[in-house]
From Swiss-Prot:
EC primary class: ligase
The gene coding this protein: cofE
Native organism: Methanothermobacter thermautotrophicus (strain ATCC 29096 / DSM 1053 / JCM 10044 / NBRC 100330 / Delta H) (Methanobacterium thermoautotrophicum)
Enzyme Commission designation: 6.3.2.31, 6.3.2.34
Reaction(s) catalysed by this chain's protein: oxidized coenzyme F420-0 + GTP + L-glutamate = oxidized coenzyme F420-1 + GDP + phosphate + H(+); oxidized coenzyme F420-1 + GTP + L-glutamate = oxidized coenzyme F420-2 + GDP + phosphate + H(+)
Full protein name: Coenzyme F420:L-glutamate ligase
Cofactor: Mg(2+); Mn(2+); K(+)
GO biological process: F420-0 metabolic process
Annotated GTP binding sites: 11-14, 45-46, 50, 118, 212-219
Lineage: Archaea, Methanobacteriati, Methanobacteriota, Methanomada group, Methanobacteria
Amino acid sequence: MGISLIGVEGMPLVGAGDDIAYLIISALNEGGEDLLDGDIIVIAETIVSKAEGNIISLEEIKPSPEALDIAERTGKDPSLVEAILGESSEIIRVGHDFIVSETRHGFVCANAGIDESNVDDGLATPLPRDPDGSAEKILRTLQEATGRELAVIISDTQGRPFREGAVGVAVGVAGLSPIWDRKGERDLYGRSLETTRVAVADELAAAASLVMGQADEGVPAVIIRGYPWGHLRSDGGVKPLLRPRELDVFRG
């Protein structure tokens, strides 16, 4: 099995009201590329939030007493801390230069997923309000425009407990199941797999992030071609990736 990662280059800076699907198709056409059946399009969450007008002006935020307290403990901008509080359902850990929280979507990550990169000074982008809904809307437009069978993943870059560095993860999914449950299959020695569940959407998002980059690469969307996901067709969204609170061994 061979998989290709194709960066969608030539996309303009995204602004409020832009149609992400249209921008992707236009950039592909300019580059002489077409979408094919089975392609998976991975899109950076930042441009989705920008297109949806989901932008935070830090200068307009008045920090609360809680934000001021956390800012003093972390060394972070009080306005940014207030924005993090607004996007969080729970603050889990704070320390010097870090805040780990659970977002309103159920993701546990740093800074509630708020990103200050690739936007103008004084602005920040939170995660899309409904990442699965955003992915579904983009998927529907792409499929109607091309007639192809596709899937869409909206990705974010997040850190992981006990490991350095950040990797791409899925925060929104449309068209495929984010989990491949392989329980009951046989390994190379004939033993039955008991617990193996593969986080396919996260693995695909991580692969795409190698092409997207984290700085000035200017590649906010990547086509993954050649991955056989026909057995994973689903409309269930990203929720299967989220570990239930009662099974969270880190928070108890």
